[in-house]
Amino acid sequence: MGHHRPWLHASVLWAGVASLLLPPAMTQQLRGDGLGFRNRNNSTGVAGLSEEASAELRHHLHSPRDHPDENKDVSTENGHHFWSHPDREKEDEDVSKEYGHLLPGHRSQDHKVGDEGVSGEEVFAEHGGQARGHRGHGSEDTEDSAEHRHHLPSHRSHSHQDEDEDEVVSSEHHHHILRHGHRGHDGEDDEGEEEEEEEEEEEEASTEYGHQAHRHRGHGSEEDEDVSDGHHHHGPSHRHQGHEEDDDDDDDDDDDDDDDDVSIEYRHQAHRHQGHGIEEDEDVSDGHHHRDPSHRHRSHEEDDNDDDDVSTEYGHQAHRHQDHRKEEVEAVSGEHHHHVPDHRHQGHRDEEEDEDVSTERWHQGPQHVHHGLVDEEEEEEEITVQFGHYVASHQPRGHKSDEEDFQDEYKTEVPHHHHHRVPREEDEEVSAELGHQAPSHRQSHQDEETGHGQRGSIKEMSHHPPGHTVVKDRSHLRKDDSEEEKEKEEDPGSHEEDDESSEQGEKGTHHGSRDQEDEEDEEEGHGLSLNQEEEEEEDKEEEEEEEDEERREERAEVGAPLSPDHSEEEEEEEEGLEEDEPRFTIIPNPLDRREEAGGASSEEESGEDTGPQDAQEYGNYQPGSLCGYCSFCNRCTECESCHCDEENMGEHCDQCQHCQFCYLCPLVCETVCAPGSYVDYFSSSLYQALADMLETPEP
C-alpha cells in the first residue's frame, strides 16, 4: 500500500482545491441540479484530477449505468486491495477513526496518518455542495451539520462523485465503500483501464451509497467478528460501506436499476441476501445492543465492520432473505430491540421502499419475514401465543428465541402500534388458528358492541387485519370462542369481556323485545281510545238529532192541531210499521244514557222521588218518538226539590243542574210527551216513515 500513498494524497489535495474554488452559490445550485447525471469524464492520471473533481461536483454519482466494469478496476487501481494487503487493518483503523465520527458532536479521534486527517477536512468541503447532503469526513463535519440536516438526517454517508473523487474517496472511504477488494486485480493495473474503473467505481459508490440495498453472499466469519466491535458504537451516522467481490457482480446486474439503487440506498437495506455467517449476526447483535445516543465511533479492526454496520444499521432489513441462521436472527433481534423506534429514516421512502420497509419500519414487527421455512411451524405456534397477548403487533417471527426477545421488547416500546401487515401465508394460518378473530381485537372493540347488538360485532371486526375473516354474527363469535378456549389461560380477560359483551347484547335484544311489547300495548290502548272516541262522536250526533226533533215538536204544537181522523190513520200506519219492526234496529232509549251520564248524582239526591214508577212512566215511549229524547222530562221530579227561582237557577241551584227546564215539565212532559200521547205516537210514526224511505231504495 505504501507505493499508492502519493496517489492518495495528490488526489485528496486536488479534490480539496476544487472544492475551495467553487463558490457557495454554485454548491447550492448543484444541490438542485446535480442529481441523476452521469460522470462521463474518463480522464486518467493525476493531471486531470481538478477537472474531474469539479465535474464530480456537478454530476453527482447517481445512475452511472453505461460503464459496468469501471468500479472494479478503480478500486484495485488505486491500490485498495483490501483483501490482498496485510497493512489493511492499520489503514482501516486510521480511516475508521478519521471518518467514523460523522455526527454533529462526535469528535473525530486521533488519526495515525496526518495526511488522511487533512484529506478528510478537504473532502468534506468538496462534498459540502452536493444535493444529497452526504457529508464528508473530518472536523468540519460538525460545522456544516446544520446545512445538511435537511438532507438525509443522520445518514452522513460518504459520497463518491467523480473519478477523481472516487480516487479521493477510495483513500477516505476505502473502509466504507470501496471495500470490494477484488483480489484478482493488482495496484499496477494499466492506466488504460482507469476510465472504465473510475466510472464503474462511481456506479459502485451509488450502490454502496444505497446502504447496501442488496447485500449478497460471502461475508466471512472474521468480518463478522470485527463487526461486533464496529457496531457497538455506531450511531445514526450509518456508514455506508462497500461489500466484497459479489457486490461488483451485483453492480453489473443493477446497472439498469441504478435509480432504483438510489432509492434502495436509503431504503435501509430492505433486501439483505443470503450467506451471512453465524458470527456476523452474533457480532451485529452485540453492536446494536449497545447503541447509545452518544454513538461513540471507535476504531474498527477491519473494513467489514463498517460493512456490516451499514447492513444492520439500516437493517431493520424488512426482508432478510433465506439462509439466515437462527443466531443471525437472534443477533438482529437484539439490534431491533434498541433500534427500531429510533431509526426513522425520513425522506427516502419510495413506493418500493413502502412495500419493503412498511412491514419493517412502520410496523416494527417482523424484521425477519422471509426466513427459510424451516421453523415455520414454530413460528405459527408462537404467533398464536402472541396474538393471544398483543395481536395488534402481529409479529410473525421466524424463530423462538427471536420471538421471545420481541415479546418483551414490543410490549414496552411499541404498545400502541397496531401492526396489521402480516405475510399472506402467516395470515392464512393465523386466521385458521385464531378462529378468525383475535382476542385482543375483541377487547379493544367490545365496548363499542355494548348496546348495539349485532352492529357492534360488525364494527368490531371492521378493524381486524386482512388475514382475519370479518365476523358478522354473534353466533359466529360464539363459535370462535369455542375455538379459542385453548388461549383462555393466556388471555382470560378477553373471554370474560366476550361473555359480558354477549350478555349486554342479549340485554339489548331483550330491551328491544320489551320496546316492541310496549309499542304493541300502546297500539292496543290507542285502539281502545279510538273506540271511546267513536262512541263519544255517536253520542254527540244523537244529541244533535234530539235537539232537532224537539224543535220540530215545538213547531208542530205551535202549528195547526191534527184532526182525529188523521191521528187514527197515523195509528194504523204505526201498527203496520210495528209489524215490520224486526227489519229495523231498535234505537236504544237515550234516557238511559242520560241517566248514566249526568243524572246519576241527581237521582241519588232526589231519593224516593225518582223511583221505578218514574222510569216506567217516562220510559215507555214509542220507538223513534221525540219524547224519548226529552231528557229533561226525566228530571221533572228534581224540580220539586229545587227551590230556586227561575231567574237565578243557574247561579244558586248547583244541585239542580236541569232546573232551567222545570217550567217545561207541566207543559211538555206531563201533557204532550206523556207516554202514549199524541206527540209520542206521531213522532214515532214519522220516524218510522223516514226510516222506510231510507231503507227501501237500497234493495
UniProtKB/Swiss-Prot annotation:
Q: What are the Phosphoserine sites (modified residues) in this protein? A: S119, S145, S333, S358, S431, S494, S567
List where in the cell it is found.
Sarcoplasmic reticulum lumen
Indicate where the modification Phosphothreonine is found in the sequence. Answer: T76
Might you report a single GO cellular component term?
Answer: endoplasmic reticulum lumen
Q: Which GO terms describe its molecular function?
A: ATPase binding; calcium ion binding; transmembrane transporter binding
Keyword terms, alphabetized? Calcium, Phosphoprotein, Repeat, Sarcoplasmic reticulum, Signal
**Where does the UniProt annotation place the signal sequence?**
1-28
Give the protein family.
Answer: Belongs to the HRC family.
Q: What is this protein called?
A: Sarcoplasmic reticulum histidine-rich calcium-binding protein
Which parts of this chain are annotated as the region 6 X approximate tandem repeats? 106-342
Q: Please note every region of biased composition (Basic and acidic residues).
A: 55-89, 324-335, 444-463, 470-481, 504-515
Residue ranges with Basic residues bias: 148-158, 173-183, 231-241, 288-298, 336-347
Classification via InterPro entries: Hist_rich_Ca-bd, HRC
> What are the start and end residues of every segment in region (Metal-binding)?
627-673
Quote the PANTHER family the UniProt record gives. Answer: HISTIDINE-RICH CALCIUM-BINDING PROTEIN-RELATED (PTHR15054), SARCOPLASMIC RETICULUM HISTIDINE-RICH CALCIUM-BINDING PROTEIN (PTHR15054:SF3)
Q: What does this protein do?
A: May play a role in the regulation of calcium sequestration or release in the SR of skeletal and cardiac muscle.
Per-repeat ranges for sequence: 106-121, 134-154, 155-177, 180-213, 214-237, 238-270, 271-294, 295-318, 319-342, 343-365
Region 4 X tandem repeats, acidic: what ranges? 106-365
In this chain, the stretch annotated as Disordered covers 50-95, 127-617
Does the keyword Lyase belong to this entry?
no
Q: Where is the composition biased (Acidic residues)?
A: 187-206, 244-263, 302-311, 532-551, 567-581
**GO biological process entries:** muscle contraction; positive regulation of heart contraction; positive regulation of heart rate; positive regulation of relaxation of cardiac muscle; regulation of calcium ion transmembrane transport; regulation of cardiac muscle contraction by regulation of the release of sequestered calcium ion; regulation of cell communication by electrical coupling involved in cardiac conduction; regulation of cytosolic calcium ion concentration
Taking the first listed entry, what is the main subcellular location of this protein, grouped into a coarse class? other
Q: Which organism is it from?
A: Homo sapiens (Human)
